[in-house]
Amino acid sequence: MFRGAWMWPGKDAAALTICCCCCCWAPRQSDKPCADSERAQRWRLSLASLLFFTVLLADHLWLCAGARPRARELSSAMRPPWGAGRERQPVPPRAVLPPPPPSPGEPSASSGTCGPRYSNLTKAAPAAGSGPVCNGVPEPTGLDAACTKLESLQRLFEPTTPAPPLRPPDSPSRAPEFPSAKKNLLKGHFRNFTLSFCDTYTVWDLLLGMDRPDSLDCSLDTLLGDLLAVVASPGSGTWEACSNCIEAYQRLDRHAQEKYDEFDLVLHKYLQAEEYSIRSCTKGCKAVYKAWLCSEYFSVTQQECQNWVPCKQYCLEVQTRCPFILPDNEEMVYGGLPGFICTGLMDTSPKRPETKCCDVQWVSCESEKKKFKDSEPPKTHHQQFHHSYFHHYHHQYHHYHPRHEPPSRVSNKPSLLPVSGGSRLSPSRIRLCVLVLILLHTVVSFSSSQSGGGLGLETLPALEEGLTQEE
């Protein structure tokens, strides 16, 4: 009895110990599972944020380190110096009044001498000198010669004609009017000179439709009055009124060329540079943009045209032919807006009368491609079948394996890929994609492991409760 009485308390103590252990070690419903799930959720959010900011940082660093220095190199390489002239097609000679024969005591004017020359004199002078030397003084060339080559005009005017005053005393704000015959003499002279950049506009066009450049009086009557004063008194000086007007027109022409160079640089940066995947034919876009730009700077009607169209038509041509280039602004994000929008087309105010420009047949990339195909020799039946069967394969191969050809061959086969063409992955882009894939794999693996651990911890309270009930 004593032994049995002594053993039962030991069994009760053991049972109490087991119960206490079960009660102490059994996890509560709101313990580790909730904490682990919250910790896993925080890890997921942290890794997702890290992935997002890594992608943004890598893309921004790639743009800063690769695109902008390359664009500056292209800018310095593509922008020509202001002293160099552009190569232009020769302009057909216009019908002008032939110069009268020289006097017996005057030497005949030959090529390379100081005689009058009627041609397009707007090309840049050679680097060796400014022009032929006449009596020890370099003769001006280009558009500057329009006001200095006055030998023919001086012969056409009568020497005995008195020089009328520039401003009669009875009407100080109005120049004297001259007959149309003398104005036609100016027409025959100024129609031979065109601007350097906007070479489709003659000085005669500008004098007729834009006689107030920079608040100057460039009317025909003023120019004729000043010319007659110079002819009547040879020692009075140069044709000052003409020189001032020509300089004003040249300043506007240089401003137009600066704007065109900026547009050309943007097109080369986004459509022809190697850092960007877009390829497009921009020859027609540049030609239309130049015509529209000149029509905005010189709002005059072109006289030397066979057919005319409203100059506003040039703006619509630019809007349809040029690609959409969104502004490069880091502070704002543009979406769905074209890079060129025509405004003021419906403005018919009398302050700005409608001007007419030449109706030009623009050369497009499709027409050049058709012309190149027409010049190829005819293909046999086997060659046509081979071309049609393997066209898709070769197109894909050359798209993913571009070949750089010399400039002489590129001009014959222009790039005809659309603006929304497929992209080419550069090494930096490939490294960025690999980094993104690694981070995504890490997030998925960590989420899977946390989900598996969470399920194991959630089943732990149920097992402990079963053991407690059995005890």
UniProtKB/Swiss-Prot annotation:
Region (Disordered): 76-115, 158-178, 399-424
InterPro entries xrefs: NALCN_aux_factor_1/2
SS bond partners: none
Bilayer topology: Multi-pass membrane protein
GO terms under cellular component: membrane
Task performed by this protein: Probable component of the NALCN channel complex, a channel that regulates the resting membrane potential and controls neuronal excitability.
Name of the molecule in the record: NALCN channel auxiliary factor 2
Native source organism of the sequence: Mus musculus (Mouse)
